[in-house]
Amino acid sequence: MQNNSIIYQLALRSFTPEGTLKAAQKRITHISSLGVDIVYLCPFFVQDEDSDISTWSKRQRLSGTYNPKNPYKLADYFGVDPEYGTKDDVRELTEEIHKHGMKVIFDLVYMHCGRNAVFAQEHPEYYLRNEDGSFLIPPGWPFPRLDFSNQELREYMISNMEYLVDVLGADGFRCDMADHVPLDFWREAFARIKAKHPDLITVNEGLEPESINGVFDWCYGWPGQYDRSFRKTMVNILTQNKPATELVNFYHANFEDYGENHKKLLLFMDNHDTASDSYMDRLECVHGSKAVEASLVIGNTYPGIAFLWNGYEFCDDAENCMFSNRYHGKRSAINWSKAFTKEGMERLSFIKKINSIRHSSDAIENGKLEWVENNLPEHIISYARVSEKQRIFVAVNTKNENVNTELKHPYDMKPLISCGAKVLKNGIHFEPYGYIVALCEGSGKNEV
């Protein structure tokens, strides 16, 4: 897959008020208009409907929705939950996505499943068990773990993946908690499917460096989920008064762990987990659209895979929750009316422009990163993406205040996109959360 890809996460329960596959299909043209390459579709499979609260995750209980159905605790890997629609609806949705020139990846939740899964009675050996025969329940998730030392289970899951690709039209998979499933299983499964579908897209919701060394295309790279993610780094800088140099530290830490594969990490500011956990403390609601745009400028130009949570493209301010649907919960779907506000229209224009720059820039796709020194390193993030053909300069004011910065190596710049940034003779004047992305004149081709 290309290094300049853009992923859009579509969570059915939050994407539309209806929360169905049919309703989502009607809005695929909208997603395509943003310049998205890959639609990441959250689980639509049959969920385990267990009313025993002791079997619910902590996040599920804290949601206050009292919804027994968790999209990440499944009962049937081949069936479509009636809440979302039918198998025909899935096929029609994937066809619509393909018609618009995009790929679609499905969520695989293989580490665990519900205790009422369709194979629970016929194949009890598929589950990991305690000595007394009870389900092995790992810390953190009160869900039964699956036993990947069982060859029949492996074949069952590989047949599931083949079905999702061949019958339902998936172009690949985002694999939930994939580090907790043996890597040799993923290696074998992907190799078998790629023999027929060599362009299969694979994403590990994990951090193991070995996983993106010839097995997965990309990974999340978030130790402890939140401790050292791109999101955590940017939130700390933008809202917790941490210095902008934290991004430099983030870069070096990832380079130490992943080497050149650090370019394979996803750069998300929100996803279904963080949006559900944050509720109304989301960056958009607390710190406003300018802070979000500052983070998205970096997320689209820094080495890695750009990632957009549904609703970010028009400043959504709704309380997203993966357990809230039309039957349970007080939280709403994303606020589509925001797309018609001045703020929402400006964000839509910004997203389309920054995505276009990302797609058409050789330096962003293939170039190395060079940090550019400035005289306010605690406030300003400044770097260049440099390829043989092109040099793209990026500078972002990460603080809610006006500043003037001087660059140690100022360039003659042709701005490609900017907001709240005025180029001076030897530096830049920034308004709060101002940014600039510019082509450095004389660096190669003169357009992006």
Residue ranges, per PLM feature:
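Substrate-binding/active-site clefts of carbohydrate-active enzymes
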Residues: 1-22, 29-37, 43-168, 188-197, ...
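Loop/helix patches that line or flank the sugar-binding groove of alpha-linked glycan CAZymes
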Residues: 2, 49, 259-412, 428-430, ...
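Hydrophobic faces of well-ordered beta-strands that scaffold small-molecule active sites
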Residues: 6-8, 39-41, 104-106, 173, ...
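Short amphipathic alpha-helices and their capping/turn segments at secondary-structure boundaries
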Residues: 25-37, 94-98, 251-258, 295-302
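Short, solvent-exposed turn/loop segments enriched in Gly/Ser/Thr/Pro and often Arg
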Residues: 41-49, 107-117, 176-182, 205-209, ...
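Active-site-proximal helices and loops of the catalytic beta/alpha 8
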Residues: 166, 176-261, 265, 315-353, ...
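Short aromatic-acidic-glycine turn motif
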Residues: 411-420
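C-terminal beta-strand-rich structural cap/linker in extracellular carbohydrate-active enzymes
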Residues: 424-448
